Amino acid sequence: MQPPGGDAPAGCPFSGARAAQPAQAAHEAPHVPGEADAQAGWHNAQLDFSKSMSYGDYLSLNSILDAQHPLSPDHNEMLFIIQHQTSELWMKLALFELRGALDAVRTDALPPAFKMLARVSRILEQLVQAWNVLSTMTPSEYSAMRPYLGQSSGFQSYQYRQLEFLLGNKNAQMLQPHAHRPDILEQVRATLEAPSFYDEVVRLLARRGFPIAAERLERDWTQPTRHDETVEAAWLEVYRHPQQHWELYEMAEELVDLEDAFRQWRFRHVTTVERIIGFKQGTGGTSGAPYLRKMLDVVLFPELWHVRTTL
C-alpha cells in the first residue's frame, strides 16, 4: 500500500517496469511491436541461443521426447507409454528425496528430513492423479494394443521395487525379475540388504533414549517390517507427550502421511486395472487385480497405525 504523499507506484518488482502515469494510460496509444522490438527481442527476452544453453538443452528434451516408441498402430499406446514413463520419473525423484531423508535421519538432522518426506508424499499424490489420465482408456482400446506388450509389466519396475524395499516391504524373490540385468540387480539387491527408512527411524528412537529391543535394532534387513512391542511403546510415549518429543512426533506424522499417500496410489492402481482389464491375468504373469488387491493389505509402519488404537 502506498502511503499518503508518497512517490508514485514503482510498478512490477519482478520485471523492473514502472507503472504508467494516469495521463499516459489515458492518452497514449497501445504499443504495436515493430522492427526495433524484433531486433531487441520480445519484451527484452533472449531469442538467440546459438551460443548459450536453452531450455530444451538444460532438460535434455530431445532425449526425453524421442523416448516414446509405440509398437502397435493403435492411437492409445502413446498414452500408455507416457503414463508409465512419467511415473518412472516421479519415482526417481521419490527415491532421491527418500534417500536424502534417510541420510538426514542417520545424522539426527530431522527438519531437513521432514521437508523431504513431505515432498515424497506430494510426489505420491501426483502419481495418484496420473491414474485418472490412464483410466480414460477403455477395455476395447487396451485390448487393441495389449498383444504388443509381450511380457512387459509394471511388476518389473526396478525403481518401484526399490521404493517398496526402502519403505520396508522386503521380498528377496522380487530380485528375480532383474536377474537378466546385473547392473540393475546390484542396485535392487543393495536396497534389499540395507536397513529401510523405518529401520533407521527405529534406530533414531533408540538414540533418543527409548528402550528398543536389541533384536529389533540389529535384525535381518532382507525381511519385511514386523510389529515390535518395544517400538510401539516408544511411539505411545511420543503420542502421549508430544511436546516433550516434538521432533519424533512430527516424524511419526510425516510417516503416516507418506503411507496414507502410498495406500491411495495402490488403491487407484488396482481400481484402474479392474476398470480396464477386469480380472484378466497381468502381462507379467501375476493374477492382475487380485494380486494388486493383496498389496492393499501391506502395512509399512505397523506400530504407527496400531498405536492409534492403544491411545
Curated annotation (Swiss-Prot):
Pathway: Amino-acid degradation; L-tryptophan degradation via kynurenine pathway; L-kynurenine from L-tryptophan: step 1/2
EC numbers: 1.13.11.11
Reaction catalysis annotation: L-tryptophan + O2 = N-formyl-L-kynurenine
Entry note: cofactor: Binds 1 heme group per subunit.
Binding site for substrate: 80-84, 142, 146, 283
Membership in a protein family: Belongs to the tryptophan 2,3-dioxygenase family.
Protein name from the UniProt record: Tryptophan 2,3-dioxygenase
Keywords, sorted A to Z: Dioxygenase, Heme, Iron, Metal-binding, Oxidoreductase, Tryptophan catabolism
Source organism, top-level taxon: Bacteria
Any single biological process term in GO: L-tryptophan catabolic process to acetyl-CoA
Residues that bind heme: 269
InterPro entries assigned to the protein according to its UniProt record, in alphabetical order: Trp/Indoleamine_2_3_dOase-like, Trp_2-3-dOase_bac, Trp_2_3_dOase
Cofactors demanded by this protein: heme
Gene that this polypeptide is encoded by: kynA
Annotated region described as Disordered, given as residue ranges: 1-37
GO molecular function, one term: metal ion binding
Compositional bias segments (type: Low complexity): 17-27
Protein task: Heme-dependent dioxygenase that catalyzes the oxidative cleavage of the L-tryptophan (L-Trp) pyrrole ring and converts L-tryptophan to N-formyl-L-kynurenine. Catalyzes the oxidative cleavage of the indole moiety.
Subunit structure: Homotetramer.
